[in-house]
Amino acid sequence: MEALAMGSRALRLWLVAPGGGIKWRFIATSSASQLSPTELTEMRNDLFNKEKARQLSLTPRTEKIEVKHVGKTDPGTVFVMNKNISTPYSCAMHLSEWYCRKSILALVDGQPWDMYKPLTKSCEIKFLTFKDCDPGEVNKAYWRSCAMMMGCVIERAFKDEYMVNLVRAPEVPVISGAFCYDVVLDSKLDEWMPTKENLRSFTKDAHALIYKDLPFETLEVEAKVALEIFQHSKYKVDFIEEKASQNPERIVKLHRIGDFIDVSEGPLIPRTSICFQYEVSAVHNLQPTQPSLIRRFQGVSLPVHLRAHFTIWDKLLERSRKMVTEDQSKATEECTST
């Protein structure tokens, strides 16, 4: 009975006992299939924290950089900041409370940049908001962030006896009507179809993340580090290899909210509390191109800066339930840009 109680987290070895008999001994193992979701989370965060500390230790001496603000208000303001430590949010704090509350992304030398991502050199900076004439980059960041939050919710929504494998969050435009996350659930759940109560439960968990006001941390790592962090996820390993192959340095971007870590190109929004109306609205089965059934979870959200009347929200919610495909999304985006 003791052996059964130890279940799949132990390996049974036989040893020759004194006198020629055989005795059994159980030793703990650390193979992928034998780690619980809690243990996986702890392992990933340990590796993330170690890499973050290692990168910080590479610049023990504080170096100063000059950051010039080129926005419409207060143009030409120059901040003297700390290299690899100060972030766009640090600069916003020197401007005003308005910039801290309204800024969703920064443009650093023209490149979209997370608000909490450290600045690496002297540069020009501009802050982006939802109310800009062209909020395209902000909208993309918001959709990515909402998808990552949904991934966090789905990974933790099922009991430990069911394996949940996050595949990826497809990059779909806001105009598609819903953000998405592709997931492979335990084969024991192949016949499961979510009820309205299930969707409400997912939504409730998402609002718990919003209420916690968690920051989106960002960390750029070598592919080998990302592969170690996600060594137990076949789909993430494949995704990491794909992303690493797209740049000669084989750098992969990771993001974290709370203790949930994911692979995301970014940039993402600063904090979960920027979301206001948020709902996990649908789950669709994708065409079976792989041995395992892939589910596409979908949701819709509006930020606190763009709240909608409930009648408009209901229309957005209804639209978000229609299955989003990447081909349709690309076609829609091309039509709107011409």
UniProtKB/Swiss-Prot annotation:
Organism: Homo sapiens (Human)
The keyword Mitochondrion appears for this protein: yes
Domain TGS intervals: 63-129
Keyword Mitochondrion appears in the UniProt entry: yes
Oligomer status and interactors: Component of the mitochondrial large ribosomal subunit (mt-LSU). Mature mammalian 55S mitochondrial ribosomes consist of a small (28S) and a large (39S) subunit. The 28S small subunit contains a 12S ribosomal RNA (12S mt-rRNA) and 30 different proteins. The 39S large subunit contains a 16S rRNA (16S mt-rRNA), a copy of mitochondrial valine transfer RNA (mt-tRNA(Val)), which plays an integral structural role, and 52 different proteins.
Compartment(s) where it occurs, according to its Swiss-Prot or TrEMBL record: Mitochondrion
Organ and tissue specificity: Isoform 1 is ubiquitously expressed. Isoform 2 is heart-specific.
Sequence similarity: Belongs to the mitochondrion-specific ribosomal protein mL39 family.
Name of encoding gene: MRPL39
Disease: Combined oxidative phosphorylation deficiency 59: An autosomal recessive mitochondrial disease presenting with multisystem manifestations of variable severity. The disease spectrum ranges from lethal infantile Leigh syndrome to a milder disorder characterized by hypertrophic cardiomyopathy, lactic acidosis, attention deficit-hyperactivity disorder, and survival into adulthood.
CDD domains found in the cross-reference section: TGS (cd01616)
GO CC annotation terms, alphabetical: mitochondrial inner membrane; mitochondrial large ribosomal subunit; mitochondrial ribosome; mitochondrion
GO molecular function, one term: nucleotide binding
Keywords assigned by UniProt, alphabetized: Acetylation, Leigh syndrome, Mitochondrion, Primary mitochondrial disease, Ribonucleoprotein, Ribosomal protein
GO biological process, one term: mitochondrial translation
PROSITE patterns (alphabetical): TGS (PS51880)
Residue positions, PTM N6-acetyllysine: 126
Protein name: Large ribosomal subunit protein mL39
